Amino acid sequence: MIGCFYNKNSLNDTLILNVSNEKPIKIDQNNNYCLGFDKNNDVCFINIFNFSKYGNFDKNYFLFNDQLNKIIMNVCKVDLSKYVNINNFVIGHIGECEEISGTHLHKCKVNIGNQILDIVCGAENARKDLNVVVATIGAILPSGKRINKGKLLGIESFGMLCSAKELGITNKKFNDQGIIELNSIYPVGSSFNEMF
């Protein structure tokens, strides 16, 4: 998943694409863009300056799509089509939820349709039989944080159960405390696109 961030005012009309967590070792920059390349010469970030001249973009965070890829190819001569419409935010169902002794944390087994993930969660409202939004490994939150495999108190965690705040959702469509609680109109395994 590519993290796509844009705000005409606060980011000085610059589109920021976070392609990977690799550190750039080479930079290619001109008046239109700045590209970062990792040790394997793969693009790890792209910044496009004066982005508003390529269209009307009113969101701050969005899913990488064909339109953005065409702009990238035109401006930077880089093809990122393999990332188009990859969404690492999916609907999951908590099948098991056990408290981790002496902590506020829970170890959850979450069905995301094609697999069951172990996820450690600190939300008070985490419980068995709840449908939730799962940020899988590789997801990038609107804050820019990339979700990686982690370990808490020796317990491996393969994703994150998300709150509306963490996803930048402020429209009161979802509960504002704890992780998002979804009803059955959101099928398990389907993409969650409410923040794009």
Residue ranges and their predicted role:
Residues 1-196:
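Phosphate-backbone binding interfaces of nucleic-acid-interacting proteins
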